[in-house]
Design a protein with these regions (language model features):
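Zinc-dependent metallohydrolase catalytic domains
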Residues: 1-23, 33-197
Length: 197
């Protein structure tokens, strides 16, 4: 019930805001069924390798790229010499975040198609922009340096700044929504963007 309130969900907000919030969280949980651990269980919950060898190899290749991205990240308040994110430790949650955002975005697109079209901008913001701004809002936090160091050493979740910014850097729709260019700090070359699913 705690998640069914702002910034995750707001009954007075439009669909783009709610899909970017609670939709991404629900998608994240669905994504765990197909992450590094969930993918080893079949539809009945039995531990079984049910993927083809080609599927597993493609998954491993993509996850290696995502691990490398996260291994390079140092939280803003600990820069320049602070500890890095452990991409291998956080990979399951990073896959969940990336998959969750992608699932929510696609679900919103389908919802608008079924409704006969996308809504007009609100306060000058397109539905795409409102979706991504809502996603960013769910990850806002202030954290003390020592708590950040502890999280980096023990928590399978990446620091929230990367649960937002590093994820959207891998989503093409984000670039389109905000006209992100190579001159912008969040730019990631298309050849380096990771899409697991």
């Amino acid at each position: 019930a705690a998640s069914l309130q702002p910034p995750f969900f707001d009954m007075t907000a439009d669909d783009a805001v709610n899909y970017g919030g609670i939709g991404a969280v629900i998608g994240h949980e669905i994504g765990h069924g197909f992450d590094d651990q969930g993918s080893t269980y079949d539809g009945h919950g039995a531990l079984r390798d049910w993927w083809s060898a080609d599927d597993r190899a493609a998954f491993e290749e993509r996850t290696k790229a995502l691990i490398s991205q996260y291994d390079a990240l140092v939280p803003r308040q600990l820069q320049p010499d602070g500890p890095h994110v452990n991409g291998a430790l956080t990979i399951g949650e990073n896959i969940g975040d990336l998959g969750g955002l992608s699932i929510a975005y696609r679900a919103l697109q389908i919802s608008y198609q079924d409704a006969g079209g996308a809504p007009e901008p609100v306060d000058g913001l397109s539905w795409q922009q409102r979706f991504f701004l809502s996603y960013a809002a769910i990850w806002r936090e202030k954290v003390r340096d020592e708590a950040c160091r502890t999280q980096l050493a023990t928590d399978p979740h990446s620091p929230t700044q990367f649960r937002c910014n590093q994820i959207v850097r891998n989503v093409d729709a984000f670039y389109d929504a905000f006209d992100v260019t190579p001159d912008d700090a969040l730019w990631l070359d298309p050849s380096q963007r990771v899409s697991i699913w």
